[in-house]
Amino acid sequence: MRLAIDAMGGDHAPEEIIKGSLEALKHFHDIEIVLIGKEEVLRGLQGKEKRLKLVYASEVIENDEVPVTAVRKKKDSSMIVGLELLKKEEVDAFLSAGNTGALMAGALLTLGRIKGIDRPALAPILPTLNGATVLLDAGSNTNCDAQNLVQFAAMGHVYAQKMFGIERPRVGLFNIGVEEEKGNEVVKKAFEELKKSKLNFIGNVEGRDIPYGVCEVVVCDGFVGNAILKSMEGIASVISQLLKEELTRNIFTKLGALLIMGGLKRITKKMDYTEYGGAPLLGIKKPVIKAHGNSKAKAIFNAIKQAKNFVDNDVLNHIKEEIESMGDELSV
């Protein structure tokens, strides 16, 4: 398996991207990594690792650039070069921690959408009390219609099925209440269609339900999804900081912390977003993974692991089969 990685994308590029990639090569012996970036940055890696290939790109798409404009103007950027390698089937998946909008625009323009999907969705995995849940969309589409939400549900169903090993993942529709009549017209229409579908739809779910793991797939538009994602990241960070402050307050709290250190480490690990890798762009014709913009080596390593699992489990073809089998159910 060959994975292409944008060495120039993200807040901590290129150092942390390179570090995470080299760590992945040590751990996974059945992968090759193609690092894409500026020659002056990557040249020193030449010959360092047998399964590491280098592809030079003269440009970088920055986080503050207008996505579509940057994609069209910077044809030799590390991001677009990586997507072109994927299009030519020279690699099996592409991963970037760079500009999210540019990655989505570039993927759409370069690779295109799966037949039957109107809009691709960003689908991160969130930690929950009972395991994890897939959230989609997490920021790609701020305005969605009911048909988009039903399509997200179908893709999320397959993704959770393959990544979590659950035959009938529970699908919940994010809303301001669990009652069927709650929400705007788009959400109400999506509820009706999901209820008629073959998916394991459990109804509406509220924000407080998500951390408890009431379902394996949470469906919403990208505006709401991004707010959920960032809120959960912030809460996890605050809880971690509060625990650290309280457990180091004095000698007695420090002694108590020693007694529960094992449990604390497990909790911290479970709530750490870097453990969950990146978010696939579901609905794109080829495997594209978006790593968190703030990713350091550990997060990049886990995003590579996720990309590998995505390809190993043939998630993309299973999504295509699911979309085809649901047919008219996806047309609202």
Swiss-Prot record:
* Matching InterPro entries: FA_synthesis, Phospholipid_synth_PlsX-like
Q: Name one GO biological process term.
A: phospholipid biosynthetic process
Q: What class of enzyme is it?
A: transferase
What is an example of a Pfam family matching this protein? FA_synthesis
According to the UniProt entry, where is the signal peptide?
A: none
What is the E.C. number?
Answer: 2.3.1.274
One cellular component term from this protein's GO annotations in UniProt: cytoplasm
Reaction(s) catalysed by this chain, per the record, are: a fatty acyl-[ACP] + phosphate = an acyl phosphate + holo-[ACP]
Q: Which UniProt keywords apply?
A: Cytoplasm, Lipid biosynthesis, Lipid metabolism, Phospholipid biosynthesis, Phospholipid metabolism, Transferase
Q: Name one GO molecular function term.
A: phosphate:acyl-[acyl carrier protein] acyltransferase activity
Protein family membership:
Belongs to the PlsX family.
- Subunit structure as annotated in this protein's UniProt entry: Homodimer. Probably interacts with PlsY.
Q: What's the protein here called?
A: Phosphate acyltransferase
User: Can you name the source organism?
Assistant: Thermoanaerobacter sp. (strain X514)
